[in-house]
Design a protein with these regions (language model features):
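Extracytoplasmic electron-transfer domains, predominantly the class I c-type cytochrome c fold
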Residues: 30, 37, 55-121
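Cys/His-rich metal-chelating microdomains
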Residues: 19, 50-51
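C-terminal motif of bacterial Sec signal peptides marking the signal peptidase cleavage site
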Residues: 13-15
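Short cysteine clusters
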Residues: 44-47
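Bacterial N-terminal signal peptides that target proteins for export
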Residues: 1-4
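Disulfide-bonded cysteine motifs in exported proteins
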Residues: 11, 39-42
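Electrostatic cytochrome c docking/interface patches
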Residues: 17-40
Length: 121
């Protein structure tokens, strides 16, 4: 009986993200190429280690490698495109007093940054 339950659980988890599904960033209007440029412009790498971004080797914030595989954003929000954009635009509103500064990103800029982060697997 335990093996049956374990098998069904693994099938349910495996079915959560269908093979061949479009990357998350394609579904919400972000562009990872623009996101990469925005990450550089906003100097996100001063605080974060970000794969693929030159000189992004900061140690203040968490490293952002494999971001697409995380279950939460900043440990407090579900890792969905909408929640990530919200966090990128207003981190102090989400968690007042945290180390992430308000970025001043527009909605489109935040979508682009999110699109780049979702390429990190």
């Amino acid at each position: 009986m335990i093996w049956l339950a374990a098998g069904l659980s693994s099938l349910a988890v495996a079915g959560c993200v269908p093979r061949g599904a479009a990357p998350a960033w394609k579904n919400f209007g972000g562009d990872p190429t623009r996101g990469s440029a925005e990450i550089t412009r906003a100097q996100c790498g001063a605080c974060h280690e970000i794969p693929g971004i030159q000189d992004a080797n900061g140690l203040v914030g968490p490293p952002l490698g494999r971001f697409a595989l995380r279950t939460t954003v900043a440990g407090v929000l579900p890792n969905t495109p909408g929640e990530l954009v919200h966090w990128l635009r207003a981190p102090q509103q989400v968690t007042p007093g945290n180390a992430m500064p308000d970025t001043g990103l527009s909605d489109q800029q935040a979508r682009d940054v999110a699109a780049y982060l979702y390429t990190l697997r």
